[in-house]
């Protein structure tokens, strides 16, 4: 996903429904689709914690719509 320009990445909002470990999450998007997501590198560096029920912004590659990357956690 890192090699695509920003215009080609799809951004969605969703809610964290399941935590697998510190870096893997299941997110349900606003349209009801469930994705397996991991957190972005900047969120790892800044130790941003995500728990069940958090609203997040998810970035999805148009080539693989089953996986996503959490790029922002709403306050």
From Swiss-Prot:
Gene3D superfamilies: Nucleic acid-binding proteins. It holds the Pfam family eIF-1a. It is found in: Cytoplasm. Residues 1-75 form the S1-like domain. HAMAP family: IF_1. PANTHER family: TRANSLATION INITIATION FACTOR IF-1, CHLOROPLASTIC. Component of the 30S ribosomal translation pre-initiation complex which assembles on the 30S ribosome in the order IF-2 and IF-3, IF-1 and N-formylmethionyl-tRNA(fMet); mRNA recruitment can occur at any time during PIC assembly. This is Translation initiation factor IF-1. It comes from Mesomycoplasma hyopneumoniae (strain 7448) (Mycoplasma hyopneumoniae).
């Amino acid at each position: 996903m890192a090699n695509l320009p920003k215009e080609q990445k799809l951004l969605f909002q969703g809610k964290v429904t399941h935590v697998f470990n510190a870096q893997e999450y299941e997110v349900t998007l606003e349209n009801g689709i469930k994705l397996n997501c991991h957190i972005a590198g900047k969120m790892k560096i800044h130790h941003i914690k995500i728990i069940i029920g958090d609203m997040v912004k998810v970035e999805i590659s148009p080539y693989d719509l089953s996986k996503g990357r959490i790029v922002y956690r709403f306050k």
